[in-house]
Amino acid sequence: MISLRIHEQPIHDQPRERLARQGAGALSDAELLAILLRVGTNGTNVLQLAQQLLAESGGLQGLQRLDFQELCRLHGMGVSKAASVKAALEIGRRLARSAIEERFPIRSPADVATLLLVEMSHLDQEHLRTILLDTKNRVQQITTVYIGSLNSANVRVGEVFKEAVRRNSAAIIVVHNHPSGEPTPSMEDIEITRQLVSAGRLLDIEVVDHLIIGNGRYVSLRERGLGFE
């Protein structure tokens, strides 16, 4: 197979050269992706390959939603390229979340959605996370507590509050996703919420809310008065 590398393009057209001259902000999504991919495929240079991948996946958001194996199966990818792309997207996601966490305290369910909605809408398993808050409702930490099917029998209260106790948090917000895409709370979700609210009172750690995320939407159990009676 003949691979066309970035350095085989005219020097003024090379994404790396343009980045050095004009800065990363001047590059298109395809040019940035081409730098990560490094080489194209037979008959397709690396910039064309990057453009094709973005078109097929629905842009950078589409690439973010693909898991590692799905990335590997895209035409022209393979394990090495998929690993580079996945790592770069994860770095970007972490930086974005860190910036949001530092910018403002949590005041509403919408603030929680700003932090986690996009990422958790597309998880293919249930994840339960806790957002740890200080006395001014600023985010201390976001912790993944469970991955897998959640019910009142397998959710251990001690695990949910473990990091909050260690960090001396004033409050927590519980967030989990429904892989089905439907965020309507189940009876199990409501029962889990009741148990956590009760435990929080004993530990003097307020459970501010429990959000369920699904397919770009979310439900606040506190707003609906479910489990916070």
Swiss-Prot record:
<dbReference type="Pfam" id="PF04002">
    <property type="entry name" value="RadC"/>
</dbReference>
<dbReference type="InterPro" id="IPR046778">
    <property type="entry name" value="UPF0758_N"/>
</dbReference>
<dbReference type="GO" id="GO:0046872">
    <property type="term" value="F:metal ion binding"/>
</dbReference>
<keyword id="KW-0378">Hydrolase</keyword>
<dbReference type="InterPro" id="IPR037518">
    <property type="entry name" value="MPN"/>
</dbReference>
<feature type="binding site">
    <location>
        <position position="176"/>
    </location>
    <ligand>
        <name>Zn(2+)</name>
    </ligand>
</feature>
<keyword id="KW-0479">Metal-binding</keyword>
<feature type="domain" description="MPN">
    <location>
        <begin position="105"/>
        <end position="227"/>
    </location>
</feature>
<keyword id="KW-0862">Zinc</keyword>
<dbReference type="InterPro" id="IPR020891">
    <property type="entry name" value="UPF0758_CS"/>
</dbReference>
<feature type="binding site">
    <location>
        <position position="189"/>
    </location>
    <ligand>
        <name>Zn(2+)</name>
    </ligand>
</feature>
<dbReference type="GO" id="GO:0006508">
    <property type="term" value="P:proteolysis"/>
</dbReference>
<dbReference type="InterPro" id="IPR010994">
    <property type="entry name" value="RuvA_2-like"/>
</dbReference>
<dbReference type="GO" id="GO:0008237">
    <property type="term" value="F:metallopeptidase activity"/>
</dbReference>
<feature type="short sequence motif" description="JAMM motif">
    <location>
        <begin position="176"/>
        <end position="189"/>
    </location>
</feature>
<comment type="similarity">
    <text>Belongs to the UPF0758 family.</text>
</comment>
<keyword id="KW-0482">Metalloprotease</keyword>
<protein>
    <recommendedName>
        <fullName>UPF0758 protein Caur_3603</fullName>
    </recommendedName>
</protein>
<dbReference type="InterPro" id="IPR001405">
    <property type="entry name" value="UPF0758"/>
</dbReference>
<feature type="binding site">
    <location>
        <position position="178"/>
    </location>
    <ligand>
        <name>Zn(2+)</name>
    </ligand>
</feature>
<dbReference type="Pfam" id="PF20582">
    <property type="entry name" value="UPF0758_N"/>
</dbReference>
<dbReference type="InterPro" id="IPR025657">
    <property type="entry name" value="RadC_JAB"/>
</dbReference>
<keyword id="KW-0645">Protease</keyword>
